[in-house]
Amino acid sequence: MKTTHFSSSSSSDRRIGALLRHLNSGSDSDNLSSLYASPTSGGTGGSVFSHLVQAPEDPILGVTVAYNKDPSPVKLNLGVGAYRTEEGKPLVLNVVRKAEQQLINDRTRIKEYLPIVGLVEFNKLSAKLILGADSPAIRENRITTVECLSGTGSLRVGGEFLAKHYHQKTIYITQPTWGNHPKIFTLAGLTVKTYRYYDPATRGLNFQGLLEDLGAAAPGSIVLLHACAHNPTGVDPTIQQWEQIRKLMRSKGLMPFFDSAYQGFASGSLDTDAKPIRMFVADGGECLVAQSYAKNMGLYGERVGALSIVCKSADVAGRVESQLKLVIRPMYSSPPIHGASIVAVILRDKNLFNEWTLELKAMADRIISMRKQLFEALRTRGTPGDWSHIIKQIGMFTFTGLNPAQVSFMTKEYHIYMTSDGRISMAGLSSKTVPHLADAIHAVVTKAV
């Protein structure tokens, strides 16, 4: 092999020369052997990642993976948390199409990076939507809002902020809760504990257990609260119960962290679904709110969300925002522009906003209709048990009370897919598919699986 000689005019040249002499010190075959023995080379050696095991599918998203592999013409996917039309098709809201067309027609729009905090107009409008335009926190500039990557991203940013800057590192989440919650907060650096919420015996709220567990929590602990349409149970506290929860939490200095993934999607009213949050803000205390526009605007794939932190003063809110930027910058630098722009167009335009509320109400009403139809279908079949929880629960999901063995039976024999805890997405049902689901539930219950 030919040797290349460098002059010693610089330390850089000397280092390069030393490296080449090292490479040339052995035979060509030795060098090639050394090269191919390197674990990161393109040779025939094993991968440095060969020790990895195959990770299981996500328990929720994996339902759709299994569904897609099933060739059955009668298969039914009730696992995914996404709205479907009566024909079982994904829905893009008309108001979203109109907003997008406005954006397309605006030739002045550019695709530059957003600030770290996101689209400022979107942030202001999101705060007004969740807290109310007349909120004292907004009026007094005691709130900071940053655009995040849908609900998951909002929770993660909030979790990391609390892990870095809040004196308590423990967060209490409901038992049960959305499967991603414990992972989000654990990886954010918080210690996750649970508080009682659902009563399997009544298929309703275990309110006494909830109060006891929050009452026993260490002062200052963080408490994750589902603002409405609890996932996965569909069981929400009454306004009177929310008031008791608020008083208890404020008396112990517990920090409320609201997950608002379904505003307007639960009752059909944006204001009704935001009432628990507004109760906490009205007392002058501090709290965090994670918002998502995946469900209520159907912007699942646009990943549009916001994190709002209500503070005691405008000065503190400004400092909080400065620290949120330091959390976001190394995580994803700045959020996407398109989805937030769609939301901003709809929220700022009175006509589009009104049209959105009508479409939102129509989606909520269809889900309520599916609940009634399923309940009536089970009653008509004489299915053993009390199924009234189906019409008492609220929002996208119903916690059926079916166990994993029963779920497995329904998947195998009836090609119905849902999470193993028996949660079904009512938004995935239609008038045509309700009888098939009712037949499957009736069969699995009467067979005592």
Curated annotation (Swiss-Prot):
Transit peptide: 1-43
Expressed in which tissues: Expressed in roots, cauline leaves, flowers, hypocotyl epidermis and root hair cells.
Catalysis performed (reactions): L-aspartate + 2-oxoglutarate = oxaloacetate + L-glutamate
Predominant localisation class: plastid
Enzyme class: transferase
Cofactor: pyridoxal 5'-phosphate
Keywords from the UniProt entry: Aminotransferase, Chloroplast, Plastid, Pyridoxal phosphate, Transferase, Transit peptide
EC code: 2.6.1.1
Keyword Glycoprotein tagged: no
In-chain residues carrying the UniProt-annotated modification N6-(pyridoxal phosphate)lysine: K295
Matching Pfam families: Aminotran_1_2
Compartment(s) of residence: Plastid, Chloroplast
Record note on quaternary structure: Homodimer.
Recorded family membership: Belongs to the class-I pyridoxal-phosphate-dependent aminotransferase family.
Role, per record: Amino acid aminotransferase important for the metabolism of amino acids and Krebs-cycle related organic acids. No activity with D-Asp or D-Ala as amino donors. In plants, it is involved in nitrogen metabolism and in aspects of carbon and energy metabolism.
Alphabetical list of NCBIfam families matching this protein: PRK09257.1 (NF006719)
Protein name, per record: Aspartate aminotransferase 3, chloroplastic
Organism this protein belongs to: Arabidopsis thaliana
Highest classification ranks of the organism: Eukaryota, Viridiplantae, Streptophyta, Embryophyta, Tracheophyta
Gene name in the database record: ASP3
